[in-house]
UniProtKB/Swiss-Prot annotation:
Region called Disordered, residue ranges: 190-246
Native species: Candida albicans (strain WO-1)
Motif residue range(s): Cx2C motif 1: 374-377
Binding site for [4Fe-4S] cluster: 374, 377, 385, 388
Biased composition (Low complexity): 199-211
Lineage per the UniProt record: Eukaryota, Fungi, Dikarya, Ascomycota, Saccharomycotina
Function of the protein: Component of the cytosolic iron-sulfur (Fe-S) protein assembly (CIA) machinery required for the maturation of extramitochondrial Fe-S proteins. Part of an electron transfer chain functioning in an early step of cytosolic Fe-S biogenesis, facilitating the de novo assembly of a [4Fe-4S] cluster on the scaffold complex CFD1-NBP35. Electrons are transferred to DRE2 from NADPH via the FAD- and FMN-containing protein TAH18.
Location of region: Fe-S binding site A: 281-300
Fe-S binding site B: annotated segments: 374-388
Name of protein: Fe-S cluster assembly protein DRE2
């Protein structure tokens, strides 16, 4: 029987530039499996007896970017070659770890130049970290251990089978539980039972009503009925809703009471017991001091007085602010008038300088013997001092006449 070992060789981009290094890496892989080299196009296949080794070489950047699609659960080994010794350049992203996990078969291994500071990410991806003895090289000692990431074999979950309950036979006979039986009644029995139920309900309701009425009489709610106050035994009459002593109030009597101002004695006695007048706030109760604030539901007029005081204060403030605004505007107008007068006076006091035609025609600044302190007036502004009379003029020759045109327009 022939068996095959599929190996994926992932190379760092810096390794691909050296062809000899790539061939050395391949030969080491073959030597580790004790096989002979036979190159067949894109993949290298070697056979020894009944074992076939398929070696696939890819650049890791193309695999991570998805340019090259590789089959899942296909490779027995994946070897990563990275010549960088620093740990920061050996870091493998989590997305690449997950892809390698999918490419490997169960119990497949990912080995080579692996990072040492990503063990947590490796375990979270699903790998198991194992240690293997590194192959002997010139710079390495025998027995040196390196980390290898192994894809574990999936464990089959145990299947729980439901079994039927065994029936045990015994000599003792057990009675089976049966549903309750209902007996159908005759018409006479139904009528008698209904009468008994109704009689019991009526007696219970009467007892409950009597007890409730007695409790109401004993509480403070008894002042609503005058008959209950006179009864000493706490019994309640059946005609509680009808009060013979209730007095009927006529609407005309109410109108007459307001018009007569208590002159009508009948109306006054009638309404004095029925009308409720609000109690005025007594200042003397608070030690002669006025209350700070009216009640929430004030009916004595204190709330209206407070609102009137607030409105009066607002009116006073508005008047004062209006007067202040008027005075401020008047002062601003006066200040503006003063400034205008000062500007007019300053313009009148200015002295105008006038030049004659002789002064404007020709001005000779280049008379020999008349030079500045620096002695380089004719050379230009770059060589003139701060107080030079020739500043702004072009270079000239000594004795040359300089004419100033349009000098009068600037005055």
């Amino acid at each position: 029987m022939t068996s095959s070992i599929n190996i994926l060789l992932l190379l760092h981009p810096t390794v691909v530039t050296d062809a000899q290094l790539v061939e050395q890496i391949k030969s080491k892989i073959y030597q580790s499996h004790n096989n002979n080299n036979n190159n067949n196009g894109g993949t290298t296949t070697t056979t020894t007896g009944t074992v076939n080794i398929n070696l696939n070489q890819q650049i890791i950047d193309r695999v991570t970017k998805g340019i090259i699609e590789l089959p899942y659960d296909y490779y027995d080994e994946i070897i990563y070659i990275n010549p960088n010794n620093e740990s920061q350049y050996r870091e493998i992203p989590i997305s690449l770890m997950q892809l390698i996990y999918k490419l490997l078969k169960s119990n497949g291994k990912f080995k080579g130049d692996l990072p040492l500071d990503q063990n947590l990410d490796v375990l979270m991806t699903g790998f198991i970290i194992e240690e293997e003895e590194k192959e002997k090289e010139e710079n390495n000692l025998e027995g040196e251990l390196v980390n290898v990431w192994v894809k574990p074999i999936p464990v089959d979950e145990p299947v729980v089978t439901l079994l039927k309950k065994k029936t045990t036979t015994s000599n003792t006979t057990t009675k089976k539980k049966s549903l309750p039986l209902f007996k159908k009644l005759n018409k006479d029995e139904i009528n008698n039972s209904d009468k008994d139920i109704n009689n019991d309900n009526i007696t219970n309701n009467n007892n409950n009503n009597n007890n409730n009425k007695r409790k109401l009489v004993e509480t403070k709610l008894t002042y609503f009925s005058s008959d209950d106050e006179n009864s000493s035994d706490g019994s309640v009459s059946e005609n509680d809703d009808i009060d013979d002593d209730d007095e009927l109030i006529d609407e005309n009597d109410l109108l007459n009471f307001n018009n007569n101002n208590n002159n009508n004695t009948n109306g006054g006695s009638l309404l004095s017991d029925k009308l409720i007048t609000p109690r005025k706030c007594d200042i003397s109760l608070n030690g002669g001091k006025k209350r700070k604030k009216a009640c929430k539901d004030c009916t004595c007029g204190l709330k209206e007085l407070e609102e009137l005081e607030v409105s009066n204060q607002q009116n006073l403030q508005d008047q004062i602010l209006g007067k202040l605004a008027q005075s401020a505007t008047l002062e601003a107008i006066k200040i503006e008038e003063r400034l205008k007068q000062q500007q007019q006076q300053q313009q009148q006091q200015k002295v105008k300088v006038k030049f004659t035609e002789e002064d404007l025609s020709e001005i000779d600044f280049t008379v020999q013997g008349k030079t500045g302190g620096c002695g380089s007036c004719a050379l230009g502004d770059a060589f003139r001092c701060d107080g030079c009379p020739y500043l702004g003029l072009p270079p000239f020759k000594p004795g040359e006449v300089v004419k100033l045109d349009g000098f009068g327009e600037d005055i």
